[in-house]
Design a protein with these regions (language model features):
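Mature catalytic core of soluble alpha/beta enzymes
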Residues: 2-7, 11, 18-265
C-alpha cells in the first residue's frame, strides 16, 4: 500500500454548540491555515488562557510546520539541524506505530522529507487539552480545522456534534449525537474537498472516515490511514485495532466498526 505523506482535508464537523449561560467562554482565531476554537463551560473566568492557548498553538507550529523555514522540521529536512527534540521524536515514533499497524498506509515522510501534516492538528489539540485541564477546566470543547476534543458538558447539556454529508454539507448532518462526557477526540478525513492533500494509491471507495479516540493525535492519524485503505481493508484494520470508526462510502451508504456503538449507540 502506498504511504500517505500529506495531511488530508478534514471535513468540518457540524457543531451544535449553543448555551443558555453567558459564562460560556470561547477563545478563537486562526492557525495552521485554518481556524481554531476553544470553548470552556465553567463558572470561573478563564480569560488568562486566551494568550496561553495562542502561544501554545504557535509553539507547536514552529516545531512541525513545513511552511516555516525556521521550524524544527524545516531545519531537519534542509539538513540544517541533525538534532531532534523529544517532542519531534515522540511524534515520529507515534507516526511509525500507526504506519506499522496500518500496513504502511500512513507515513511521516514524503519525497521532501518529514511531514506531520496528517497528525499535527490532532497533536496540537491534545496539547491545548493538557493546558486547559492543567488550569482546572474539565468542561471544554476544542476544535481545530474540523477536528475536535471535548470533555464534560456545556451548561445546558452534552456537547453535540454531527458528521457532515460529504456530497452536500449544507443539508442536515449525516448523523448527530451527544459526545460522551468522559471525553473523546474525533477526526474526519476524506478527499472531495481538497483532493491535492491525498497522496498515494488506494481503492477510493470512501467519501469520508471518522475516527473517535481518546487521543486527538491518534484519531487524526488513523482517519488518514483508514481512508487510504478503503472500505473493506479499512474496516478490517479498524476491527483488529479496536477502533471506533464511521465510514461513508462513495455511494453515500455508511458502515461502522463494532466499537462505534460505544460512541453513538
Amino acid at each position: 500500500m502506498t504511504s500517505v505523506v500529506r495531511g488530508l482535508s478534514l471535513f468540518c464537523l457540524t457543531f451544535l454548540v449553543s448555551c443558555s449561560n453567558s459564562i460560556l467562554q470561547d477563545f478563537s482565531g486562526e492557525i495552521y491555515g485554518t481556524t481554531y476554537s476553544v470553548k470552556i463551560a465553567e463558572n470561573s473566568s478563564y480569560a488568562h488562557l486566551e494568550s496561553k492557548i495562542k502561544n501554545e498553538l504557535t509553539r507547536v507550529d514552529y516545531v512541525f510546520s513545513t511552511y516555516k523555514p525556521s521550524s524544527e522540521i524545516s531545519l531537519i529536512n534542509n539538513g540544517d539541524s541533525l538534532e531532534w527534540s523529544d517532542e519531534f521524536r515522540n511524534l515520529y515514533e507515534t507516526s511509525q506505530k500507526i504506519s506499522t499497524l496500518s500496513g504502511g498506509a500512513f507515513s511521516p515522510k514524503n519525497d521532501n522529507g518529514y511531514d506531520f501534516s496528517a497528525i499535527g492538528k490532532g497533536y496540537a489539540i491534545d496539547k491545548i487539552a493538557e493546558l486547559v485541564e492543567q488550569n482546572g477546566a474539565n468542561n471544554y470543547f476544542i476544535e481545530i480545522g474540523g477536528e475536535i476534543r471535548s470533555k464534560g458538558a456545556k451548561f445546558n447539556g452534552n456537547w453535540i456534534f454531527g458528521i457532515d454529508r460529504p456530497i452536500n454539507s449544507k443539508k442536515s448532518p449525516y448523523i448527530a449525537f451527544n459526545i460522551p462526557r468522559e471525553g473523546i477526540s474525533i477526526a474526519t478525513s476524506g478527499e472531495y474537498r481538497e483532493p491535492n492533500h491525498i497522496w498515494g494509491g488506494g481503492p477510493r471507495d470512501l467519501l469520508s472516515v471518522t475516527v473517535a479516540h481518546e487521543s486527538a493525535t491518534y484519531a487524526d492519524a488513523w482517519a488518514t490511514a483508514l481512508y487510504v485503505l478503503g472500505k473493506d481493508q479499512g474496516l478490517k484494520t479498524a476491527e483488529s485495532n479496536g477502533l471506533a470508526v464511521f465510514f461513508i462510502s462513495s455511494s453515500s451508504d455508511s458502515t461502522q466498526s463494532s466499537n462505534w456503538s460505544m460512541i453513538s449507540p
